[in-house]
């Protein structure tokens, strides 16, 4: 009876969120001095040992597929997690597993694995095979679900697929990805899937964002988060720190309001 009580208590301890996608989920917002030393209140990261640890930037540090640690920055996960903790009063566990420069096809179940590069990846990983994005998302999410209920799958990706020659078929690929992910995690449609638009000043945003906005026609229990009014770094690809913070609040508000 005692073991059962401890197990149940552990499973109810955290609200768990799977945070996946490409560079804007990994984070490219520039840090403020306190970001990398001050833990977020009530927010935890699933570490490389599968344990919850206090969340300190960069939040994508424990991703098993990430690019080099120096490339990681502030993402929407920062304010999203803070907001969800403030609204619920419960501890939030982020399962961060994003990688910059990745296409939707590279996230599909069974997609061919690629290799780490020799530029922006950690030197100790150069030319090694990168673990399957899909398999690692499932594996790490399951590890996180040992500590609480999976509350949402939080996604930001699309820049790599926004070119006119790549945009066709994106929604059907995303639909398959979400269906497989929910199935393999054993959660079905009860767990929301949340996706946000790319930087509004990006040259491909006028075509990509309206397409993604119709996500509800493709994926049950899914929400689109508008990026309108948000600003980017000088590269016009990545959201700046201030906009990442606002974006995360929009994600949290949408999830809390169910729309």
Regions found by a protein language model. Give the residues of each.
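Cell-envelope and extracellular/periplasmic
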Residues: 11-259
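Bacterial Sec-dependent signal peptides at the C-terminal "C-region" and cleavage site
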Residues: 3-13
């Amino acid at each position: 009876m005692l073991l059962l009580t401890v197990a149940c208590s552990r499973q109810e301890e955290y609200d768990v969120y799977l945070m996946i996608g490409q560079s804007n989920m990994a984070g490219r917002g520039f840090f403020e001095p306190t970001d990398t030393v001050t833990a977020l209140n009530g927010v935890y990261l699933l570490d490389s040992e599968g344990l919850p640890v206090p969340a300190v930037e960069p939040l994508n540090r424990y991703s098993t597929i990430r690019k080099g640690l120096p490339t990681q920055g502030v993402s929407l996960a920062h304010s999203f997690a803070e907001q969800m903790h403030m609204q619920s009063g419960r501890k939030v566990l982020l399962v961060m597993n994003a990688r910059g420069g990745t296409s939707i096809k590279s996230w599909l179940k069974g997609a061919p694995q690629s290799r780490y590069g020799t530029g922006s990846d950690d030197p100790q990983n150069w030319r090694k095979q990168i673990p399957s994005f899909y398999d690692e998302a499932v594996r790490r999410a399951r590890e996180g679900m040992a500590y609480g209920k999976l509350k949402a799958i939080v996604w930001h990706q699309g820049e790599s697929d926004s070119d006119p020659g790549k945009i066709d078929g994106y929604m059907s690929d995303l639909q398959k990805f979400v269906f497989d992910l929910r199935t393999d995690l054993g959660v079905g449609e009860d767990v929301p899937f949340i996706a946000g638009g790319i930087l509004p000043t990006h040259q491909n945003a006028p075509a990509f964002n309206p397409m993604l906005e119709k996500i509800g026609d493709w994926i049950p229990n899914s929400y689109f988060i508008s990026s309108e009014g948000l600003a980017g770094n000088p590269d016009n690809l990545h959201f700046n720190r201030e906009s990442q913070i606002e974006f995360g609040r929009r994600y949290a508000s949408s999830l809390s309001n169910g729309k």
